[in-house]
């Protein structure tokens, strides 16, 4: 598995792209563990999310997993394409972002090399 260098990664297997707009998604590791997503529940636009706290969920043919916010902030947009076709989240996890956020607090996260090592141990 490879992880793009332009993102930071959480221990909850989510990525955050610190660019404009700031986007959040799941990692390839999470996508493989889930298999094929069949339902995605994302935070509402305008809602506040807190780093390390559940803010939605993704349901697959195998299981249901919480989406845990990698940063705190206000949700600016959700990816309607992923809501309409949840399989996008697991088919191409590094392209299929879930939501955009205005960050108010960004905890220390891992770069791609550190996350790759972390994922190999998981």
Regions found by a protein language model. Name each.
Residues 48, 66, 72-74:
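Beta-solenoid/beta-rich acyl/carboxylate-transfer cores
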Residues 1-54, 87, 91-122:
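Acidic, low-complexity mobile loops and tails
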Residues 75-91:
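Short, charge-rich, low-complexity interaction segments located
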Residues 34-40, 61, 69-72:
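Short, solvent-exposed beta-edge and connector elements
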